[in-house]
Amino acid sequence: MSSGKIAQVVGPVVDVAFATGDKLPEINNALVVYTDEEKSRRIVLEVALELGEGVVRTIAMESTDGLTRGLEVLDTGRPISVPVGKETLGRVFNVLGDTIDMEAPFADDAEREPIHKKAPTFDELSTSTEILETGIKVIDLLAPYLKGGKVGLFGGAGVGKTVLIQELIHNIAQEHGGISVFTGVGERSREGNDLYWEMKESGVIEKTAMVFGQMNEPPGARMRVALTGLTIAEYFRDVEGQDVLLFIDNIFRFTQAGSEVSALLGRMPSAVGYQPTLATEMGQLQERITSTKKGSVTSIQAIYVPADDYTDPAPATAFAHLDSTTNLERKLTQMGIYPAVDPLASSSRALSPEIVGEEHYAVATEVQRVLQRYRELQDIIAILGMDELSDEDKTLVGRARRIQFFLSQNFNVAEQFTGQPGSYVPVAETVRGFKEILEGKYDNLPEDAFRSVGPIEDVVAKAKAMGY
């Protein structure tokens, strides 16, 4: 194990000089430095560049407070390695695998895996066409998720990405069991804390590993924490042959941290100030999130859209890797429709008659046609009013508004805020409900009865309570 000395500290960037003739650490190797002689505080650095003349430039995974020139740095000889396997379930830890849930740390002999790995080879991959039921009507009907697929939840600030992810964790864990890995990348610590206690109360935590590198962490930790979560998911997939759910909130923060690191390393910025290696970094992460013949990883990734601009390089680069996209729209939140999923902008590779079946496909496409026609008629309605529409279009507008409201539902995880119990709606009931609305069976019921309900029976009961 070779050792060097700190030559320079500039924020999270630390230059380490090794003696001439010593073996230099490889790129991505973890280096360890202790801030005092008692070794009470350890800081891990990751090698990013070799500057020549025995000097390497590293990125710190923790705050560099207390580091001084001349401190000894040890090369561990391998990348950052984190605990994997059943010991991680029910635990909360950071990018380095150190526990942060105030419980006993992992044992020294716990199995560990390096966070930097190659993606599975082409012949190891598996293609699945099985639908993953979420219990959320708008998703299951119009943009269904594939088991072993990649899903992106796109949306600007405050439109409900994290709440939707929390509801998906709740529904999938309660209804399907299985193992989940939640990775918090550069998001609010408060949300992570809420999620942890919620999972603890519901018992879901026993089948979940949680990894956090939140907003207050240095860019190195925020950039690498997604790889830590992914490494744990890969172990369950490859060694234990499990079907794993990997939740990442938020992929944009991974890109943002990469941009900070790139600037700190002195690289020339690319479009909109992002790192020139944006597509490569995203590809290296996304290509590892896949399903093999041994097991599957279904990933659900929240993706922040800066200023609601979908052409921004960060969300645009992520788009290319996804099977399903769920787009959250601010206009729908203003109308009080939650989840604020845009039924026309969201899409899925799984929405085909071969995968979801003829009836589901026919109902979904007809729902989209009705909503699209309603969108086209909105300008006419705004200028001339409803009276100028043909009888056929008036009927269509009424059904479109009922469909739009029926796409909303109460969430279990939001019950403490709304006071309304959440609902889980099986796919078959979702398809039946929308089919009956399209057939005109509920044209006589008020539009308000369709807002924030579960299955179609709830609409009838709500209308009855309203006196219809």
From Swiss-Prot:
**How does this protein sit in the membrane?**
Peripheral membrane protein
Concerning HAMAP family, the annotation shows:
ATP_synth_beta_bact (MF_01347)
Its quaternary organisation is: F-type ATPases have 2 components, CF(1) - the catalytic core - and CF(0) - the membrane proton channel. CF(1) has five subunits: alpha(3), beta(3), gamma(1), delta(1), epsilon(1). CF(0) has three main subunits: a(1), b(2) and c(9-12). The alpha and beta chains form an alternating ring which encloses part of the gamma chain. CF(1) is attached to CF(0) by a central stalk formed by the gamma and epsilon chains, while a peripheral stalk is formed by the delta and b chains.
The residues listed in the UniProt record as binding ATP, with positions renumbered to this chain, are: 155-162
Q: Kindly report, in one word, the top-level EC class recorded for this enzyme.
A: translocase
- NCBIfam families membership: atpD
Q: What is its EC number?
A: 7.1.2.2
Q: Where in the cell is it found?
A: Cell membrane
Tell me what organism the protein belongs to: Streptococcus thermophilus (strain ATCC BAA-491 / LMD-9)
Functionally, this protein is described as follows: Produces ATP from ADP in the presence of a proton gradient across the membrane. The catalytic sites are hosted primarily by the beta subunits.
Q: Which family does it belong to?
A: Belongs to the ATPase alpha/beta chains family.
GO cellular component terms, semicolon-separated = plasma membrane; proton-transporting ATP synthase complex
> Which reaction(s) does the protein catalyse, per the Swiss-Prot or TrEMBL entry?
ATP + H2O + 4 H(+)(in) = ADP + phosphate + 5 H(+)(out)
Q: What is this protein called?
A: ATP synthase subunit beta
Keyword Hydrolase recorded: no
Q: Where are the transmembrane segments?
A: none
Q: Name one Pfam family in it.
A: ATP-synt_VA_C
Please give the Gene Ontology molecular function terms for this protein: ATP binding; ATP hydrolysis activity; proton-transporting ATP synthase activity, rotational mechanism
Q: Could you tell me the keywords of this UniProt record? A: ATP synthesis, ATP-binding, Cell membrane, CF(1), Hydrogen ion transport, Ion transport, Membrane, Nucleotide-binding, Translocase, Transport
